[in-house]
UniProtKB/Swiss-Prot annotation:
This is Ribosomal RNA small subunit methyltransferase A. The gene is rsmA. PROSITE patterns: RRNA_A_DIMETH (PS01131), SAM_RNA_A_N6_MT (PS51689). S-adenosyl-L-methionine binds at N28, L30, G55, E77, D103, N124. Specifically dimethylates two adjacent adenosines (A1518 and A1519) in the loop of a conserved hairpin near the 3'-end of 16S rRNA in the 30S particle. May play a critical role in biogenesis of 30S subunits. One of its GO terms (cellular component) is cytosol. GO terms for molecular function: 16S rRNA (adenine(1518)-N(6)/adenine(1519)-N(6))-dimethyltransferase activity; RNA binding. NCBIfam families: ksgA. It comes from Agrobacterium fabrum (strain C58 / ATCC 33970) (Agrobacterium tumefaciens (strain C58)).
């Protein structure tokens, strides 16, 4: 398809550099630049904003973000094969793209941006690290976080877990952590054929906004409670949280011990954590 930013079509770029997506890195390349623009627009206004991107690959989404006016993109890429392609984008947008070769799970993202700078996180996350990265971004001790919003692509099943509420089959630890500190929504689905190679599942773009004042709670305690409760989700709470105090803890929190984890609201999980 024709380029929309003055750079060559992505398929041509990938072919010229002999790039193919590596399954071991959880890569799936997006070719459709109209689709990458749709993802970037979902994030909200980009003028004057620094964008953090993880796993840019050949830079389809990077190009969309820059073409929509982002002040700067800081992209963390583990695959050195992609660096020459990203260097071409960097040359096309002088001073607006910084590429860091490294492991996103070991990166201190907040340290990459000057304090007080408006930041949005936009990424087609590698499938094998996406969930852990999200949890890392959701659970800093200080809140509000350094980011204004997160617009992230996941496998659809993961997206459903992020936005799920109590009573939903997809509700679990991820839904509690996301629901505690953010307002999240599934923006739109992306079919397998949009990628190369096509994954076996549909993907979805999730948009998250931080809550100004989430309910006060110790991060570590909330993690302990959700891990215990959903670790044995089919059992009654008196059994699943037995290691944390069982019925004594539940009585203190005012929660019926015969209930199961998936019936508890985010607020009830926070109460439970605060009673530890």
């Amino acid at each position: 398809m024709a380029a929309i930013d003055g750079l060559p079509p992505l398929r041509d770029v990938i072919q010229r550099h002999g790039l193919d997506a590596k399954k071991s890195l959880g890569q799936n390349f997006l070719f459709d630049l109209n689709l990458t623009q749709k993802i970037a627009r979902t994030a909200g206004p980009l003028d004057g904003v620094t964008v953090i991107e993880v796993g840019p690959g050949p830079g389809g989404l990077t190009r969309a973000i820059l073409s929509l006016g982002a002040k700067k993109v800081i992209a963390v890429e583990r695959d050195s094969r992609c660096l020459p392609v990203l260097a071409e984008i960097e040359a096309h947008y002088p001073g607006r793209l910084e590429v860091i070769e490294g492991d996103a799970l070991k990166t201190d993202f907040e340290a990459l941006v000057p304090a007080g700078e408006p930041v949005r996180i936009i990424a087609n996350l590698p499938y094998n690290v996406g969930t852990q990265l999200l949890v890392n971004w959701l659970l800093p001790r200080e809140w509000p976080p350094f980011w204004l919003s997160m617009t992230l692509m996941f496998q659809k099943e993961v997206g459903q877990r992020i936005v799920a509420e109590e009573g939903d089959n997809h509700y679990g630890r991820l839904g509690v952590l996301a629901g505690w500190r953010t307002v999240s929504e599934m923006a739109f689905d992306v079919p397998p054929q949009a990628f190369s190679p096509p994954p076996k599942v549909t993907s979805t773009v999730v948009h998250l906004l931080p809550k100004d004042k989430p309910l006060p709670c110790d991060v570590a305690k909330l993690e302990r409670v959700t891990e215990a409760a959903f670790g044995q989700r089919r059992k009654m709470l008196r059994q699943s949280v037995k290691s944390l105090g069982g019925e004594t803890l539940l009585e203190k929190a005012g929660i019926d011990p015969t209930r199961r984890a998936e019936t508890l609201s985010v607020e009830e999980f926070v109460t439970l954590a605060n009673c530890l």
